[in-house]
Curated annotation (Swiss-Prot):
PROSITE patterns per record: DNAJ_1, DNAJ_2
Signal peptide stretch: none
Protein name, UniProt field: Curved DNA-binding protein
An example Gene Ontology molecular-function term: bent DNA binding
Amino acid sequence: MELKDYYAIMGVKPTDDLKTIKTAYRRLARKYHPDVSKEPDAEARFKEVAEAWEVLSDEQRRAEYDQMWQHRNDPQFNRQFHHGDGQSFNAEDFDDIFSSIFGQHARQARQRPATRGHDIEIEVPVFLEETLSEHKRTISYNLPVYNAFGMVEQEIPKTLNVKIPAGVGNGQRIRLKGQGTPGENGGPNGDLWLIIHIAPHPLFDVVGQDLEIVVPVAPWEAALGGKVTVPTLKESILLTIPAGSQAGQRLRVKGKGLVSKKHTGDLYAVLKIVMPPKPDENATALWQQLADAQSSFDPRKDWGKA
């Protein structure tokens, strides 16, 4: 196996401390990350930097590497290498030396299986109005960069322009193939999963594909009937209130709910009778006339009965 100049790869000196090397690694990992860099050899450079960091970040491996690098031009290097404790290693042991330094990379690099990258999940808030049709959305997330030990070394910001399809529901998962972390040894990238979160609406409650809205009406509107303006997700409509309507009564408006691939839900207007403020003398007299005219009516007649 070729002994690479890891210091040159990292752009540092053999005398530099770990902090300096770590700073260089983070800068180069960000520069050559395959999902960020536009350079044609970015993936190869990224892996090379990661390999160098794996060795130089470990004090023991770095010391052994430095000793091997010092003797790289020695004619005896290919036949015999002297470890720090004076022990001699023959050519057949050379592979083992590399393995001890590089954590089996030297011996098994070509035998390691392709590993798929990690998936990433992010929550995407969506307003009810946005679910009615397909819309574009710019999303930003952090792409973790893993070191050779499987630990997150840093995070690289990434931005994508995506399409959110019509009819998405709360908790729905949308897969963006290959937008997760890069694979290893030729393995495929992980995926990015968008988790849809329907934001609460100040007027509408969601019940499956249907919507509910509380519609305040005056007592005389409930008694006499009439038309009131009611908002929907698209526009306002005139809702007919039947005469004799009761508080809590649900009036169905067909096709004004949420859309989906299978069908469109309905809107249900739930009537709420709202009393006017404290009445004046004239209003009180009218209420008294109504009470006298309906003296036989007992609203609690069936109260408590099954």
